[in-house]
Amino acid sequence: MLRKGCCVELLLLLLAGELPLSGGCPRDCVCYPSPMTVSCQAHNFAAIPEGIPEDSERIFLQNNHITFLQQGHFSPAMVTLWIYSNNITFIAPNTFEGFVHLEELDLGDNRQLRTLAPETFQGLVKLHALYLYKCGLSSLPAGIFGGLHSLQYLYLQDNHIEYLQDDIFVDLVNLSHLFLHGNKLWSLGQGIFRGLVNLDRLLLHENQLQWVHHKAFHDLHRLTTLFLFNNSLTELQGDCLAPLVALEFLRLNGNAWDCGCRARSLWEWLRRFRGSSSVVPCATPELRQGQDLKSLRVEDFRNCTGPASPHQIKSHTLSTSDRAARKEHHPSHGASRDKGHPHGHLPGSRSGSKKPGKNCTSHRNRNQISKGSAGKELPELQDYAPDYQHKFSFDIMPTARPKRKGKCARRTPIRAPSGVQQASSGTALGVSLLAWILGLVVSLR
């Protein structure tokens, strides 16, 4: 039989399990303290459940049937809100007014949302991750990202966006990841990416791009990854890619490239590019159909006229000895950076480059891009959003940085100083032994 004291303790434990934390917890939800977390995902809610504690910092409402958001649904104390995969059709402009602590907002996979008011995200000064993938958006209003100076990750993929106006991202000075793939963009103007001075990854594949302004990437000096595959591009000027001095991964396949004279500047840039790039398959002219633009020779452009003459093209070809000498002066990704370009030199640039050190040990997978990378803290391509791993392919990113071929200078043998005996070889040892025996014989006589 249980003692009276034990029964009281058991009753208290049972009551504690039934009582909601911090003054209340919504029905069918689970709440956790420190930090206050409300988990209500996958419960077929048609509206925001009542009774969410005002001190809630993390709220998880994904995989329900919620249809709209308005002011008063959440407390300004909120830091994280996941409300993806619902049926949201409307977000009141002042829904997040005063949410100065909000850092992560996932509104993705609400396919009937379609439009957003310009002031929807106004004042979210700490927001660092914003998920708007698969929201049925066909356009973005001017100023919608105004003031989001802390934003680092912006996911806009798999919408129906056809056009982006100049300076749409101009306030996103700390943005590192911009995902725009799977939309209907047909052109990139001069000022679309203006201000994105810290952008690291730009994914534009699987759009309908036909034209890119030659200054579209002007501010992207820190970009390392650019995907333009599976578009409708036929031409891309080499000058367009010239500002991308830190670029490491480039994909241009899946376009109908014209490999005639118009491709010459891109061909020249690709010859200088030191990173990893896809094939650039030629669609025209007919005699080059199926060839890789990168494999064409100087002679293929000899009859082209324009700013760059065949003589200028030929000047880029190097002899074997020249290439070996050039490698001695070309810094690798792990070597010292040019002060003017903290993230590396323009691919193929020669002036101002620093000579690498003589240490011939290899860099082992530095800055490797892998599938096992961390989750929400540093989202990779496979981490668009929680429970979203099945919605894309893993094979679009390389698994490691491209290996570079380098030559180590032949080591100069170090000779012993004058007067110091070196380690003897077999012949020298025999001579020394013979001399010692002769000396011994002479002394015995």
Swiss-Prot record:
The chain crosses the membrane at residues 424-444. A lipid is attached at residue 424 (GPI-anchor amidated serine). Residues 25-54 form the LRRNT domain. Detected in brain (at protein level). Expressed in various regions of the brain, including the cerebral cortex, hippocampus, striatum, thalamus and cerebellum. Residues 352-366, 401-413 have a biased composition (Basic residues). LRR repeats lie at residues 55-76, 77-98, 101-123, 126-147, 150-171, 174-195, 198-219, 222-243. Belongs to the Nogo receptor family. This is Reticulon-4 receptor-like 1. It comes from Rattus norvegicus (Rat).
